[in-house]
Each structure stands twice: as structure tokens, then as C-alpha cells.
């Protein structure tokens, strides 16, 4: 009895080869399975991606359909540390105040205005017309005088990853560990020490605030508009496919408020449809 040959999903020709590929419920000649964009062969790849019956290599799928940073618009890989603000996702180093450029830390309050991230000081300055005291002061005669501005240290994404990872292991490292971390990050021991001190203070304040929540008066504009706490998350490869264009109903409160509260780490599933 003659067995009917399978047809290749790419070229449509019968498959008489001893070996062939089964992808997405279809059969392929080994040499016919290629990325629809770059045309690279996929027969020796560990995985590929299918979307609307088109086959993609990992790089092209990530470039076209993967999660992207809301600040720099570059792709976010599965190994990137990220920060979330509502439905927006940012690289760790990209999450900074749009006004002053200062990177925001875990536990620090911020606001979103038209998808722009603002620190607490510049948010209040924007909505209430106030001024921050860090830029200029006023003497007794009413004349303004400039204050010496403290130089802020800006950390790279890689440095923040190392610092955050070590903080999770030990929030109060000794001198030897501080020297090791400083050597790895390329920072001075003093800067590293101050970063850990500030992180411990923010952590303590955040924990204390969680135990002693006091309801703000209704007239407090900051209580109405800013109640986001920064969290960080480590992206994992998606184990279960998710719809990129799915409805977001139920993810956020329905009451009228410009901000939501993030209290847990979460992951971004940027690689659905992997086969």
C-alpha cells in the first residue's frame, strides 16, 4: 500500500526526504523552514516563532513584536531588569524623571503625566506651580541667590543590575563586600556605600509606611495623583502564550485616579507564540 506523501508548507512540494520538520502543525522540508524576514535557515535553531502563519527567527520576532522600552523604544530582552509604571515598561536605567533626568529608585514616589515620568518634586512643581528649593534660595532682602547644586551620580543599567542583585542578597554589606561590588561596577567605594545606605533607608521607610498607612485628607492633591511605589522585575521567558493585543479590563481600578499602586514584582512576557 502506497503511503501518501506530506506536502511542504513552504514550497507545496511533496516531502520524500527521510527527515523533515514539524512546526505549528505543518510539515516542512528542512531547507524550506526559514525566517520570513531575514530568510535565515531555522532547521538547526532550537526554536522559532509563528505569528499569523508566518515563521520568524527569535531576533526578528523580538524586534517586531517583543516588548519595547517606553523611553528609548529599544527592545527588552528576557534577561533585562525592568521597571513598570501602569502599562508602560522601562529599562532600569531609562526609568528617570523626564524633567531633571534623575534615575528613580525602588520605593520612591513618582507620577505619570501623558506617559512622561516625573519625580515627586517636579510633579508638584508642574501641577501646583511650585518651585523646588534645590535650585535657588532667597535671602532676607528678597534677592535670589544661587545655591551650590550637589552633583548626582548617574548609574548605568548594568551598574544598577549589580547593585540591586547584591542588595537582595545582603542589604548591609561589610567593607570587603563593598570593595568587591565597587570593583565590579566601576564605582568608588564611597558611592557604593551611599547607594546601599539610601536603599536601606528607602526600604525601611517603605515597610514602615505599609504598616502604618494613614489616609490623606481629600484636599491633598499629591495623595490624589501620586501613589505609585517603584518596583523592579526580572523578565522571564513566557511559559504560557499571551495575547499581545488582549483586553486590559480588570487590571487597574475603575475609580477616577491618575495613578495606581504597584506593590509586587512582575514579569513581562515578551515572547509568545514560541514553538
From Swiss-Prot:
GO molecular function, one term: DNA-binding transcription factor activity, RNA polymerase II-specific
UniProt GO BP: compound eye development; imaginal disc development; neuron differentiation; regulation of DNA-templated transcription; regulation of gene expression; regulation of transcription by RNA polymerase II
Keyword tags: Developmental protein, DNA-binding, Homeobox, LIM domain, Metal-binding, Nucleus, Phosphoprotein, Repeat, Transcription, Transcription regulation, Zinc
Domain LIM zinc-binding per the UniProt entry, residue ranges: 6-67, 68-129
SUPFAM superfamilies, alphabetized: Glucocorticoid receptor-like (DNA-binding domain), Homeodomain-like
Annotated compartments: Nucleus
GO cellular component, as recorded: nucleus
CDD domains membership: homeodomain, LIM1_AWH, LIM2_AWH
Coiled-coil region(s): none
Free-text tissue specificity from the UniProt record: First detected in neuroblasts in stage 9 embryos. Expressed in all 10 abdominal segments and in the labial segment during early embryogenesis. Expressed in the stage 14 developing epithelium. By embryonic stage 16, expression is refined to the abdominal histoblasts and salivary gland imaginal ring cells. Expressed in both larval and imaginal cells between the salivary gland and the salivary gland imaginal ring, in late third instar larvae. Also expressed in specific areas of the larval wing, leg and eye-antennal disks.
Signal peptide residue numbers: none
Main location: nucleus
Residue ranges of DNA binding: 148-207
Region of interest: Disordered: 253-275
SMART domains tied to this protein: HOX, LIM
InterPro entries the record matches: HD, Homeodomain-like_sf, LIM_Homeobox_TF, Znf_LIM
Modified residues (Phosphothreonine): 126
Function: Probable transcription factor. Required for the establishment of a subset of imaginal tissues: the abdominal histoblasts and the salivary gland imaginal rings.
Name listed for the protein in its UniProt record: LIM/homeobox protein Awh
Organism, scientific name: Drosophila melanogaster
Organism ancestry: Eukaryota, Metazoa, Ecdysozoa, Arthropoda, Hexapoda
Gene name linked to the record: Awh
Amino acid at each position: 500500500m502506497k503511503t501518501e506523501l506530506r506536502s511542504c508548507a513552504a514550497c507545496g512540494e511533496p516531502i520524500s526526504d527521510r527527515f523533515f520538520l514539524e512546526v505549528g502543525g505543518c510539515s516542512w522540508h528542512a531547507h524550506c523552514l526559514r525566517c520570513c524576514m531575514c530568510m535565515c535557515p531555522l532547521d538547526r535553531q532550537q526554536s522559532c516563532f509563528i505569528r499569523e502563519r508566518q515563521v520568524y527567527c527569535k531576533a526578528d520576532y523580538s524586534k517586531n513584536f517583543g516588548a519595547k522600552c517606553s523611553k528609548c523604544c529599544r527592545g527588552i530582552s528576557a534577561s533585562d531588569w525592568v521597571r513598570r509604571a501602569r502599562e508602560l515598561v522601562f529599562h532600569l536605567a531609562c526609568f528617570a524623571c523626564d524633567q531633571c533626568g534623575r534615575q528613580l529608585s525602588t520605593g520612591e514616589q513618582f507620577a505619570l503625566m501623558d506617559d512622561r515620568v516625573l519625580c515627586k518634586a517636579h510633579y508638584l512643581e508642574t501641577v501646583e506651580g511650585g518651585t523646588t528649593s534645590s535650585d535657588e534660595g532667597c535671602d532676607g532682602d528678597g534677592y535670589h541667590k544661587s545655591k551650590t547644586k550637589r552633583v548626582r551620580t548617574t548609574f548605568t543599567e548594568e551598574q544598577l543590575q549589580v547593585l540591586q542583585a547584591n542588595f537582595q542578597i545582603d542589604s548591609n554589606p561589610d567593607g570587603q563586600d563593598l570593595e568587591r561590588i565597587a570593583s565590579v561596577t566601576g564605582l568608588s567605594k564611597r558611592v557604593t556605600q551611599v547607594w546601599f545606605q539610601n536603599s536601606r533607608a528607602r526600604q525601611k521607610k517603605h515597610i514602615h509606611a505599609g504598616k502604618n498607612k494613614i489616609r490623606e485628607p481629600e484636599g491633598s492633591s499629591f495623595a490624589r495623583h501620586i501613589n505609585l511605589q517603584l518596583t523592579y522585575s526580572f523578565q522571564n521567558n513566557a511559559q504560557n502564550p499571551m495575547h499581545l493585543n488582549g483586553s486590559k479590563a480588570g487590571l487597574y481600578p475603575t475609580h477616577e485616579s491618575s495613578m495606581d499602586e504597584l506593590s509586587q514584582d512582575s514579569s513581562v512576557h515578551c515572547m509568545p507564540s514560541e514553538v
